[in-house]
Amino acid sequence: MISDFNNQEITLEDLEQNNVKLKEGKAKVQFLMRFSLVFSNIFTHIFLFLLIIVSGLFFGLRYTYYNYKIDLITNVYKIKPSIPKLKEIYKEVLEVVDEVKRETDKNSEDSLINKIDEIRGIVKEVTNIAKEFDEKSKEVKPKVEKVIQEGKQVTSNLDKITKEIQALQVNGNGLASRVRRSLTGDINTITNLANNIDFDFNSVKESIEKITGLAQQISKEGKSITKNVEEIKNEVEYFTGKSKEPLKDIDKIKQIYDKKIPIFEKNNKKLQEIWNKLMGIYNEFTVKETKKDYYNYVIYILLFLIIDSLILLVITYMSMISKTIKKLLLFYIFGLLSFNPIVWASIIISLFSRPIKNRKNKFY
């Protein structure tokens, strides 16, 4: 038997039982406090993550409000009716995209991308012919100019021949008249005819020689013209034959355009209709004028809760390492300010550990 601090006699067995009860109570206190701290720490992480997401959302809403005048909060009731419209627009966009994908599919022979390669080949062939024609035209051009020049010369010579023939006709008519008059006259007239006829014959002979010379020159120039014209003709026939296929291919290009352009015109018209529908939905959520501090109060509250949650995380980590009354009081204060129901529940649980009564134990 021994006496305690109150001079009451107790046995060693009573002391041992009392010591066991104290240890069990202390273990229970430590468990409740540790559980409340861990529990609040975990859900503060989750709550902080949600706060960051919501804050990002509100910052986005604030940005669209001030930059695009879109007010989703006031017009939130319009979101649900707009969803079916957006789904319909989405289907229409998919139809346009599918059609465009078909036209850009390299595995499809009828796709526009393959037709473009075909058009590129045709254009290259036509370009090569044009280049060849340009090179040949440089060779043909002097021949054409020569034909024109020789043609002018032939025309000039023909005019000269015409004049000589006219002169020959005049001389011949004059000679015939004198002969007729002389045959009906006397001997003196015949004598004069003999004297003049030599001159007339010389004039006729000279005209005939000129005509003969000009005719030979015309014949020579005609052969040259014929030769050059034949060469020009051959070149023209060469290019005429060579251009038949490219000309058919150009018709093929026209057919491709006639077939494919309506598709893109239709899609362009459809995209314009889709855009008009989207703008109609967009206009339903816009406001004429923005208010200065419309979203600020929400942003301030969210920032306060984020800062409070960060401080609460630091306090819970520190309290799990070393629990003191000061840390627990801070835990209670910032836990209440967190507006987190689960943290409030953790605070209530921690109160069962009677932290004020057990403050001397420091909850180790």
From Swiss-Prot:
It is a multi-pass membrane protein. Its main location: membrane. One of its GO terms (cellular component) is membrane. SUPFAM superfamilies: Methyl-accepting chemotaxis protein (MCP) signaling domain (SSF58104). Gene3D superfamilies: Methyl-accepting chemotaxis protein. Keywords: Membrane, Transmembrane, Transmembrane helix. The keyword Endoplasmic reticulum does not apply. The keyword Transmembrane applies. The chain crosses the membrane at residues 41-61, 298-318, 329-349. It comes from the Bacteria. It is found in: Membrane. This is Uncharacterized protein MCAP_0005. The lineage of its organism: Bacteria, Bacillati, Mycoplasmatota, Mollicutes, Mycoplasmataceae.
